[in-house]
């Protein structure tokens, strides 16, 4: 009897296994990315279903953890030695690069999910050697287990690093539950080579196949002073956090580099003062690494062999570590005290004149002219070096606006320290959302405008009888129910699960800039707000101490209108409502910051701005992902909002019903009706449905409507709601999804912190 051979060919590269082979994405690369609505669910989470991260964090020996982190800073390991005997610079970079991927346009990126552990971030060229930083932390993470998430630990370690080198931080807040899989929703750009930027800029670079090195370009590029970065990106190159430290596309021009710095830092919510503080403060510590050319550097973690165990960038130069380390290809130590907080960076920036040179790896950098060798070597106490700087460091001197700030910081170290402390806190907490999510003993008491503050509840809340009476009064106001539904949706759907901003709490729908957004139907909005303000005034004028906020009334009115719509459809149902929202003031609202949240498109309301944009159905899925919705939840909400007649402009596109305003499943029934034939009547954006026999016009629709009959997966869901037994299920599911959206920002109600479920 012969021995059976393994069906898998030895060392075969043929992916003839589950998940291998040519995929749907390969055949149809432009297909709708519904997979982003199936991420970060209980299926991928190894923790128990009832695990409460907030409770776990609050039981943490916080001071013991910080003590262990402080000890680690100077506990140099042979397998990855500490520069200058202190890991502070490495851990500051780790925390900075964890948080620094955040961008204002969609709130994605940032430190909130610990995504630096996963592809692509774990293998970005800008994150070389951070794999070692996280492994240095593993014994501490192992000790404290699930009481501290990786997401929180990466940031706290950066704080402790600063404190261990004499800097007083502004504070720290925990509250970042981990995710357990690589994020597929964030758009990082279209380039297919590391360090490329030829897709995000009209005239960019094609990139490089080198590892552990940036691009050096001798040529001058006129467009770098005025080029415009693709939205929503906030990095100048694929695989970089912000900008190329050698200068734009490797061109060592500090003035041109300032343009890229201002653009990218601005897209991360930083103004000029915060930008100068972060660069000067961060570069007070540590060094860069470029001991030899990039040819010595091996594959990144995602491409390295199994034996590397998740580490990457193996370096064959010398020992491959310590004095032989290659990270960026730059070899710069900014100050003579790289493990102490002081003003040396700014002092040297203005004290010396600088001349262009190259690192041992061939990267552009600058060296002080006619300067003494005052900079210590990271590993040899007998060696000294001349001061060195990056091109982007010199931008703080040669850009007029940056120079003014930098000189003020030089002359007023106290202002510099305060600005850096605040900017660092903002950098590392910008994507955490409201203060209600903050955990731990070091949460600063000062309320900051970028936290989108909302006053605390300071009065008794309405009870069940009050709610019933208020609903009756609202529905008797004479305002069409669709105005209340539209206003409630407009308020609540500003929420972004990415950075936890937006939502109905605060009633900012009545304030600038939201009240003026094109997507928010102005007549309907004014009509609804006017009626609700009158209801609020009458209720709050009563003799008792109970009060109702406008934010609560906006949501309550939407709920009441949905209940009426369900009743009119023959399916009475109670829509849940929990009071406790408060009203923010205009002074508590950063208009510029909220402007970034104005949608280019909102398929839930059939809104799309301008022709130069992705297709409406892709924006619809993007919006659904930001709302933490599943594909079924997105589907049922669109179908319900259409029959409720809530298109932003009052149009009838997608209103496939003879009973607009009633919460029926008519949208799905008529969309899937094979007696209707569809044709394009608006350049692929508008469609007309006609009777197949008579040719008579029946409906009009947008891409955000027809996708539910066109896309195979969405059609499968639509069929459930279009079936004869699907009408009541449709109403129940719509109410559940509606309630979810209305409460996405109610962190005050959520007794535990988890990744929001998509059901």
Curated annotation (Swiss-Prot):
It is an enzyme of class 1 (oxidoreductase). This is Catalase-peroxidase. The active site is at residue 97. Its cofactor is heme b. Its main location: cytoplasm. The lineage of its organism: Eukaryota, Fungi, Dikarya, Ascomycota, Pezizomycotina. GO terms for cellular component: cytosol. HAMAP family: Catal_peroxid (MF_01961). One of its GO terms (biological process) is cellular response to hydrogen peroxide. It comes from Aspergillus fumigatus (strain ATCC MYA-4609 / CBS 101355 / FGSC A1100 / Af293) (Neosartorya fumigata). It comes from the Eukaryota. It catalyses: H2O2 + AH2 = A + 2 H2O; 2 H2O2 = O2 + 2 H2O. Binds 1 heme b (iron(II)-protoporphyrin IX) group per monomer. There is a cross-link at residues 96-242 (Tryptophyl-tyrosyl-methioninium (Trp-Tyr) (with M-268)). Keywords: Cytoplasm, Heme, Hydrogen peroxide, Iron, Metal-binding, Oxidoreductase, Peroxidase. Pfam families: peroxidase. The record marks 93 as: Transition state stabilizer. It is found in: Cytoplasm. One of its GO terms (molecular function) is metal ion binding. The keyword Metal-binding applies. Monomer. Sensitive to heat and heavy metals. Belongs to the peroxidase family. Peroxidase/catalase subfamily.
